[in-house]
């Protein structure tokens, strides 16, 4: 079986970050982009795509590029903004696919796209839970505690449980496995994200 070519971005990481900042000023949105970038980089290495870590990371970093300025056209304005910034069609497809079934009809096919689809909403849930905990950190967080928050529909109500469940199904993972891996990814990157956010 012929090996698929490695996915690479024509952008450097600095260029991708500048592109995000061009359209996003809200510290919350910037933190979310940096968090999802770090989580995607962790998953790339964890799942055997280490040679594509930069690509996975940039897709995570830029996945909500249009949300701050165009919330009603989320994932619909992104292709234009990304194309103007020099992004490849492959990167654009990866970014847009995370909105499948909610704001676009671009389905996530590659494992990277499925991870983004699953982890995007889940990072928000984990972050909300972390803010409640001692030290406002994911450090020491356990799956059992996150499960309770997941079942409480009033907690972080903006984080779609249905999307998280569908994401796990698309990956062929148990929900518990997705929780465990994403918690570990956020724990591993928390310090770097905090520093990038000036904390």
Locate the predicted segments by residue.
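Divalent metal-dependent catalytic cores for phosphoryl transfer on phosphate-bearing substrates
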Residues: 49-155
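Acidic/His-rich, divalent-metal-binding segments that scaffold phosphate/diphosphate chemistry
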Residues: 2-70
């Amino acid at each position: 079986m012929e090996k698929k070519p490695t996915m690479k971005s024509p952008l450097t990481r600095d260029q991708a970050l500048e592109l995000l900042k061009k359209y996003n000023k809200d510290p919350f949105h910037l933190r979310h982009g940096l968090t999802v970038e770090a989580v995607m980089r962790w998953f790339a290495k964890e799942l055997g795509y280490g040679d594509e870590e930069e690509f996975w990371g940039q897709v995570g970093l830029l996945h909500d590029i249009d949300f701050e300025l165009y919330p009603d056209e989320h994932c619909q304005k992104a292709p234009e903004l990304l194309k103007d910034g020099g992004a490849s069609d492959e990167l654009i497809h990866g970014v847009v696919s995370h909105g499948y079934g909610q704001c676009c009809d671009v389905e996530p096919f590659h494992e990277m796209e499925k991870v983004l689809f699953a982890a995007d909403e889940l990072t928000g849930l984990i972050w909300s839970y972390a803010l409640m905990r001692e030290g406002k950190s994911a450090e020491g967080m356990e799956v059992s505690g996150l499960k309770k928050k997941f079942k409480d529909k009033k907690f972080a109500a903006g984080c779609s449980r249905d999307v998280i469940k569908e994401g796990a199904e698309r990956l062929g993972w148990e929900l518990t496995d997705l929780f465990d891996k994403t918690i570990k990814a956020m724990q591993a990157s928390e310090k770097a994200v905090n520093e990038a956010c000036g904390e």
